[in-house]
Design a protein with these regions (language model features):
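C-terminal subdomain of the subtilisin-like protease fold in secreted/lumenal serine endopeptidases
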Residues: 217, 359-400
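Structural recognition of the beta-strand scaffold that forms the well-ordered cores
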Residues: 51-54, 171-176, 214-219, 269-273, ...
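Sec-dependent signal peptide recognition
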Residues: 3-13
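Substrate-binding/access-modulating region of protease and related hydrolase catalytic domains
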Residues: 180-288, 334-339, 343-345
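Subtilisin-like serine protease catalytic core
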Residues: 37-196, 292-294, 304-306, 312-316, ...
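Catalytic metal-binding/acid-base residues of hydrolase active sites
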Residues: 58-60, 221-223, 275-278, 302-304, ...
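N-terminal signal peptide c-region/cleavage motif recognized by signal peptidases
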Residues: 19-21
Length: 400
């Protein structure tokens, strides 16, 4: 999410740089460029439900009546882990009451930062810029901590809102995870936490597959630099080579868990975020840096389909979508317009779900291939998602 530079040091590091400015040039939340590519799936009243996995920071189920998968007990299908990688099966993170009481204020701040960081000269953007300039170091630390936790808390709800838009045939299963917070960060990273993190990743992936999910939204990456930032802040006396070794061990362990789980689920398409560090994927080294037929890495362009300075790139990134002020509701139902590769991913997931509503027999690799084949290239060569062409191509596939 392109919220504020302060979040780069906090939540964004753990979210693979999901807080870099989007550099938008105008204030509209959507452009005609992308609207002309939208897909509709009318006339499919008898279509089977398509289950989507929202593997993120949690989702507010009340915002999506009839589109949250329910278990035999009638409750939303949810599995979650807290920041210490312990099971906590709640749809949203459990936050301190004092922070929840500030929800209206924090939501307003997020919207103001959406404006400021995407170049929208609104009164709210000017006010938040002035507030940040006037903060003392102590005030800035408290602001960063509160906003970092809140930004993570709302992230998954916005992802779900984008993924479900315009598709009454889709429903979500919620896989929730949390990241560290505070300064110094809690928890401070250890080899034991790395093992628990990998185990939780394997468990959540299996949980989604076991519950019939066909497309999984992964707007995260677990980049090496995130763990290095954590250790630098909370373990300053640890030798640099030890910090690097622990960070790489964590990334490699999570990567192995992801590869094993995805290989065992060929019917599922997994969609990951390239990240917003403005680097190549090998330099960023996220845990999602690998190639499988049913795994797709997504980069971001702006609302006019143009290249951005901040998306990660490389041959591993085979599809791009809008990551510029994408409309996404907050847990209270209010609007926001975040930016980043986090927001590009659910647009691809949305298109994939519409394709599956038309052609449910496609497996993960076939779905990925169709999305890539129907993309069109912009002036700088990035292949851009084209949901309308993808759905039309799916309609032409003969039924088995």
């Amino acid at each position: 999410m392109a919220r504020t530079e302060t979040l780069v040091k906090l939540v964004a590091a753990a979210l693979l740089g999901l807080a870099l400015p989007a550099h938008a040039q105008d204030a509209e939340p959507a452009a005609e460029f992308w609207a002309a590519r939208e897909a509709t799936i009318e006339g499919l009243e008898s279509a089977a439900r398509v289950r989507l996995g929202i593997w993120d920071s949690g989702v507010e189920p009340a915002l999506f009546p009839g589109q949250v998968a329910l278990g035999a007990d009638g409750a939303p299908i949810v599995r979650g882990y807290d920041a210490f990688k312990q099971r906590q099966d709640t749809a949203l993170a459990v936050l301190p009451a004092a922070l929840l009481e500030r929800r209206a204020e924090l939501n307003d701040i997020l919207r103001a930062l959406d404006d400021r960081d995407s170049g929208v000269d609104s009164p709210q953007a000017r006010a938040i810029a002035e507030r940040l300039r006037q903060q003392t170091p102590a005030e800035a630390a408290g602001f960063d901590d509160a906003l970092g936790r809140w930004s993570g808390y709302v992230h998954g709800t916005g992802i779900a809102d984008i993924a479900l838009a315009g598709n009454p045939h889709a429903e979500i299963v919620i896989a929730r995870m949390e990241w560290w917070h505070g300064s110094p960060p809690q928890p401070c990273w250890t080899r034991g936490l790395a093992a628990r993190e990998a185990a939780s990743v394997a468990d959540l992936l299996g949980f989604l597959v076991d519950n019939g999910v066909r497309v999984v939204n992964m707007s995260w990456g677990r980049a090496e630099r995130a763990y290095l930032s954590n250790l630098k802040a909370c373990a300053p006396d640890m030798p640099e080579e030890e910090r690097l070794a622990l960070a790489r061990y964590t990334v490699e362990t999570i990567r192995a868990a992801l590869i094993e789980g995805m290989k065992a689920a060929p019917r599922v398409l997994f969609v990951g975020a390239a990240g917003n560090a403005g680097s190549d994927m090998k330099t960023a080294n996220p845990a999602t840096l690998f190639a499988l037929p049913n795994f797709l890495l997504v980069g971001a362009v702006d609302r006019h389909g143009r290249a951005t300075e901040w998306t990660n790139t490389g041959p591993e990134v085979t599809l791009y979508a809008n990551g510029d002020r994408v409309p996404a509701r907050l847990p209270d139902g209010g609007p926001s317009f975040p930016s980043g590769t986090s927001m590009a991913v659910p647009l691809v997931v949305n298109a994939a779900a519409k394709v599956l509503a038309v052609q449910p027999q496609l497996d993960g690799a076939g779905l990925r291939t169709l999305l890539e084949r129907t993309a069109t290239r912009n002036g700088t060569g990035q292949p851009l998602l084209h949901p309308q062409r993808a759905v039309e191509a799916a309609r032409q596939i003969p039924a088995n």
